[in-house]
């Protein structure tokens, strides 16, 4: 192999840390050389009697570090008595020092004020550039490990879903009831979604891993080689400069100085790299690809599932991926244009300026990360489109914005509560549809576009401007109504959307009536940190305004201030416990069919409505419940439990 074309990536593979340690040794070695010139400056004042001891001192230092500087701390093959070219040159410099016993103050000043400072600057530059490369490697490795961990989590989640599906199947085989059949269907849909997630994450990881080991890591290793050669090249220049000063001041030593310079000239930067690389080369193979592993109890294949509700997840994922791909390609074009201006100063040249090298390292690091991201997205998009074609055609996709909710809010998809600054959620900017972050990719593409689910002033903090990271809170006067309907996990997002909309309209048109004013007492100190949540002290008495509806919160009035407080932090008196306890039959059902009330005692319902049951057996096959604040009776066989 020619030294002119020698590259670390030809012989080193997954050895970044070994190379980084070697580069660090070289950078720290510059400190030794800097100290050498400072000490020589003082020794020059004492003439020849000090020069011999100085040469011996640094000869010993060189001997102790010879192996680490030549072949690294943990070489694959011992170098024996061999030393790298730089150390050989350094040895000849020390030999010359022994023979040079006379000098004067000017030489001492030149060594102290010129050479030592250049070495200090070179060391700081090398260390700064090494840290940049080290940070890039950590980012790339972290991203790879993150993808691998996501595959492992998806695999565990998929296998658990298979277990749940098998359990649901066994229950259905045993009972053959409508409820068990519905649970079986939901479990199967959940398992298939998690299978797709597992497969896609695995494919993305494999592609990312290939790019990491075949392109990203070799590129970093080659740049580390260039960095070391940059150090050696600049070190050679400093050494030459130091002896040029000595030559100009000591004509009698001119011939010896020329000889040393010729030896330094033989120290080609690539020689150290080649010696290090050849003594650290070892057998290495690319890690094997991951393959789909089906659950032991669920026989399956590695094919993506595009049937039924799985389409929602794949459709949303495809649209998100294509949008992200466009952004990443735009970013890549921008980075290419920035790099074009730096390529005049060749980034692979050992003589490249520090500022240019640092800028090009940062930009090329970003470029590698963007290319890796583009590769990941293209793998995912190609896989989905090859199996399901253009799923996104004809869909009315929500334009979600990620938010945090200060007060409890109901997810319009799964009907569970979204709450807390750490609980991430999404709000559609077009229709106000709210959901968990985890539900975003499961929401059907049926945006109402201009028909908001809730009034914007009540749903989102309007003081927040164009940002994806803001807090949202409900501002309804009846705070706990915003999360009353949270007892359904039905997957029909259209029905969920309509029900949520009807609930909000009821809240806007029907003022909340406070509960009977019955006193209670606060059991523990509580500090309210969010809007609508009050602060209370142990022993304070209060008036109950709204009871706990199952959310874990009550609305109370203390010393003229009303707000929410955890139900577990208060104690109600016996009269209140009796008055606010729900009927034993209280639960929720979903309407299977529409029914129009025939009298004032009956309740009109629509398919998909969620009804709170107050009496399951009202007589003659009828039940009693509450819908949109209205209480009435409805046919018991028109509904099903949720």
Curated annotation (Swiss-Prot):
Cell compartment(s), UniProt: Cell tip; Cytoplasm, Cytoskeleton, Actin patch
GO biological process terms held by the UniProt record: Arp2/3 complex-mediated actin nucleation; clathrin-dependent endocytosis; regulation of actin filament polymerization
CDD domains named in the record: C1_SpBZZ1-like, SH3_Bzz1_1
GO cellular component: actin cortical patch; cell division site; cell tip
PROSITE patterns the record matches: F_BAR, SH3, ZF_DAG_PE_1, ZF_DAG_PE_2
Disulfide bridge positions per record: none
Gene: bzz1
Zn-finger segments (Phorbol-ester/DAG-type): 397-447
Sequence ranges assigned to domain F-BAR in this UniProt record: 6-272
GO molecular function list: cytoskeletal protein-membrane anchor activity; diacylglycerol binding; zinc ion binding
Biological function: Plays a role in endocytosis and trafficking to the vacuole. Functions with type I myosins to restore polarity of the actin cytoskeleton after NaCl stress.
Coiled-coil annotated spans: 113-190
Alphabetical list of InterPro entries matching this protein: AH/BAR_dom_sf, Bzz1_SH3_1, C1-like_sf, DAG/PE-bd, F_BAR, FCH_dom, PE/DAG-bd, SH3-like_dom_sf
Highest taxon listed in the record's lineage: Eukaryota
Family note: Belongs to the BZZ1 family.
This protein's UniProt keywords: Coiled coil, Cytoplasm, Cytoskeleton, Endocytosis, Metal-binding, Repeat, SH3 domain, Zinc, Zinc-finger
Name recorded for this polypeptide: Protein BZZ1
């Amino acid at each position: 192999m020619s030294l002119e074309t020698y590259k670390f990536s030809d012989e080193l593979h997954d050895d970044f840390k070994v190379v980084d340690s070697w580069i660090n040794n070289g950078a720290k070695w510059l400190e030794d050389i800097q100290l050498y010139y400072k000490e020589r400056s003082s020794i020059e004042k004492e003439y020849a009697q000090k020069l011999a001891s100085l040469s011996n001192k640094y000869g010993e230092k060189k001997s102790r570090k010879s192996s680490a500087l030549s072949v690294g701390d943990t070489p694959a093959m011992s170098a024996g008595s061999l030393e790298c070219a730089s150390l050989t040159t350094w040895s000849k410099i020390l030999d010359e020092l022994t023979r040079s016993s006379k000098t004067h103050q000017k030489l001492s000043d030149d060594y102290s004020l010129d050479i030592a400072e250049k070495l200090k600057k070179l060391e700081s530059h090398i260390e700064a550039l090494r840290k940049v490369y080290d940070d890039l490697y950590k980012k790339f490795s972290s991203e790879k490990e993150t993808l691998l961990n996501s595959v492992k989590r998806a695999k565990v989640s998929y296998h658990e879903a298979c277990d749940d599906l098998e359990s649901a199947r066994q229950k259905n085989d045993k009972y053959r009831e409508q409820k068990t059949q519905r649970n079986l269907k939901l479990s199967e849909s959940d398992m298939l979604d998690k299978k797709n997630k597992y497969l896609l994450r695995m494919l993305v990881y494999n592609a990312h891993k290939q790019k990491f080991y075949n392109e990203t890591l070799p590129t970093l290793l080659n740049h580390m080689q260039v960095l070391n050669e940059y150090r050696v090249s600049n070190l050679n220049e400093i050494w030459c400069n130091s002896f040029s000063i000595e030559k100009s001041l000591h004509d009698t030593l001119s011939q010896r100085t020329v000889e040393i310079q010729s030896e330094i000239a033989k120290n080609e930067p690539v020689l150290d790299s080649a010696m290090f690389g050849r003594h650290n080369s070892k057998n290495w193979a690319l890690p094997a690809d991951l393959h789909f592993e089906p659950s032991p109890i669920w026989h399956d294949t590695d094919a993506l599932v595009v049937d039924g509700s799985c389409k929602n997840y794949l459709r949303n994922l495809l649209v998100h991926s294509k949008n992200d791909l466009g952004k990443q390609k735009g970013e890549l074009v921008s980075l290419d244009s920035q790099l074009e201006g730096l390529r005049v100063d060749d980034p692979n040249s050992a003589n490249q300026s520090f500022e240019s090298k640092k800028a090009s390292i940062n930009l090329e690091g970003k470029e590698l990360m963007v290319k890796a991201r583009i590769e990941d997205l293209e793998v995912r998009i190609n896989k989905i489109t090859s199996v399901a074609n253009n799923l996104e055609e004809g869909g009315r996709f929500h334009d979600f914005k990620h938010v945090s909710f200060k007060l409890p809010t109901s997810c319009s998809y799964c009907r569970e509560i979204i709450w807390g600054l750490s609980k991430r959620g999404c709000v559609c900017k077009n229709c106000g549809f709210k959901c968990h972050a985890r539900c975003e990719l499961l929401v059907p593409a049926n945006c109402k576009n201009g028909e908001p689910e809730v009034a914007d002033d009540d749903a989102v903090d309007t003081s927040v401007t164009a940002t994806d990271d803001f807090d949202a809170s409900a501002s309804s006067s009846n705070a706990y109504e915003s999360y009353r309907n949270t007892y359904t996990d039905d997957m029909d997002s259209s029905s969920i959307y309509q029900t949520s909309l009807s609930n909000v309209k009821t809240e806007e048109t029907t003022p909340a009536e406070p509960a009977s004013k019955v006193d209670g007492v606060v059991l523990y100190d509580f500090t309210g940190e969010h809007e609508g949540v009050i602060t209370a002290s142990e022993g304070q008495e209060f008036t109950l305004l709204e009871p706990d509806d199952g959310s874990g919160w009550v609305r109370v009035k203390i010393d003229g201030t009303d707000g929410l407080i955890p139900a577990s932090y208060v104690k109600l008196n016996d009269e209140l416990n009796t008055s606010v306890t729900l009927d034993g039959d209280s639960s929720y059902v979903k309407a299977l069919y529409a029914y129009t009330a025939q009298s004032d005692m009956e309740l009109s319902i629509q398919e998909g409505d969620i009804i709170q049951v107050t009496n399951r057996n009202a007589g003659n096959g009828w039940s009693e419940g509450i819908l949109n604040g209205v209480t009435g009776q409805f046919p018991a066989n028109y509904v099903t439990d949720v």
